[in-house]
């Protein structure tokens, strides 16, 4: 599945998830279970119709699973892009704030007050990025 590979290559694969299930890695099986039932010559009556209905529903569920997995992988890739953009924005804002503070400090304060402010600023914890964890 191509989106899953892209997600892994981008380093955005959710931890602890493991590999994709075999049912989503390989193409669906060809053929029809009804053909096997007919060739065996067994008289199954209503069981044949029930098996065919179950087979069809399993195929529908597999298609939905593949579609949902593709959408989740696409969302994971978008979240990775947004995270990178957020890091860039936060870094730019931090640089702007530092420049503004430097200009204000230089205009309004003496040397002792500048040192006090630098010490107090270093005691604040660094801004942390939100954790955009994803679970599939």
From Swiss-Prot:
Bias type Basic and acidic residues, positions: 101-121
UniProt xrefs under InterPro entries: DUF4530
Domain of life: Eukaryota
Coiled coil segments of this chain: none
Chain positions covered by the region annotation Disordered: 92-136
Protein name: Glutamate-rich protein 4
Organism from which the protein derives: Mus musculus (Mouse)
């Amino acid at each position: 599945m191509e989106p899953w590979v892209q997600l892994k290559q981008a380093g955005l694969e959710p931890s602890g998830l493991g590999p994709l299930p075999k049912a989503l890695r390989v193409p669906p099986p060809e053929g029809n279970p009804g053909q096997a039932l007919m060739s065996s010559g067994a008289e199954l009556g209503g069981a044949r119709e029930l098996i065919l209905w179950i087979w069809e529903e399993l195929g529908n569920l597999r298609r939905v699973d593949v579609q949902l997995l593709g959408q989740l992988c696409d969302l994971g890739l978008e979240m990775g892009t947004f995270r990178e953009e957020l890091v860039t924005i936060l870094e730019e804002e931090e640089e702007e704030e530092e420049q503004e503070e430097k200009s204000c400090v230089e205009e309004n304060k003496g040397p002792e007050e500048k040192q006090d402010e630098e010490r107090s600023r270093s005691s604040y914890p660094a801004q942390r990025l939100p954790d955009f964890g994803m679970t599939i």
